[in-house]
């Protein structure tokens, strides 16, 4: 539930993958991908009990970034997105093999015709690590400005798309990682300019780093 623990576990999991250290996961049982019940991905990732959750569009007004309060609201909203992005990356790692098998067995020639390659898992583990870095950058800026992640209400809108696509790998890849991420790329430069106009160079540096990483998420 703790985003800071999520970041730490993400770093550990990526290190384990790079070093070839097994830390759980499924296995083939004839033509079925089996995952122990304790390792099934949750229907909804847990959140801290004191999190203030509101409907999409009902969170604190962000303004145009001219005031520190407005910039805090913008950074907080972005940190919420990055926290969900960590969850989404790991969710597609966990669900991918079973969904790939389902596609193969469907007989649809446009679907994947072989087990997912190691590069699939490596790419999404790297994505999870990037999102963890992004959350950390944003959380640090919030702390620098006298706030913290969790100080403002957040919404769970991104996870709604995950629920809608959890039974279709191609839909998940298209909606989450092409549509939503691409929308972020469109908005990011405008957000960066708001912080630049306010003279917030440290946030500009953090947001620019995030933007450049997100470009690779869409292009690969």
Language-model-detected regions and their locations in the chain:
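Non-heme di-metal
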Residues: 1-220
């Amino acid at each position: 539930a703790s985003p800071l623990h999520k970041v730490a576990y993400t770093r550990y999991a990526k290190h384990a993958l790079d070093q070839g250290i097994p830390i759980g996961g499924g296995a083939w049982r004839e033509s079925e991908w089996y995952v122990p019940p304790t390792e099934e991905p949750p229907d909804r990732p847990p959140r801290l009990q004191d999190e203030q959750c509101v409907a999409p569009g009902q969170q604190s007004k962000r303004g145009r970034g001219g005031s520190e309060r407005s910039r805090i609201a913008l950074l907080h909203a972005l940190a919420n997105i990055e926290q969900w992005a960590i969850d989404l990356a790991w969710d597609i790692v966990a669900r991918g093999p079973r969904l790939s098998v389902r596609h193969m067995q469907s007989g649809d020639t446009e679907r994947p015709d072989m087990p997912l390659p190691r590069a699939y898992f490596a790419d999404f583990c790297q994505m999870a690590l990037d999102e963890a870095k992004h959350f950390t950058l944003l959380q640090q800026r919030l702390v620098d400005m006298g706030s913290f992640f969790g100080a403002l209400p957040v919404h769970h809108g991104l996870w709604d798309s995950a629920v809608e696509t959890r039974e279709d790998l191609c839909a998940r890849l298209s909606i989450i990682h092409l549509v939503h991420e691409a929308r972020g790329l469109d908005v990011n430069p405008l957000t960066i300019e708001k912080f630049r106009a306010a003279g917030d160079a440290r946030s500009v540096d953090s947001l620019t780093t995030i933007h450049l990483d997100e470009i690779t998420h869409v292009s690969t």
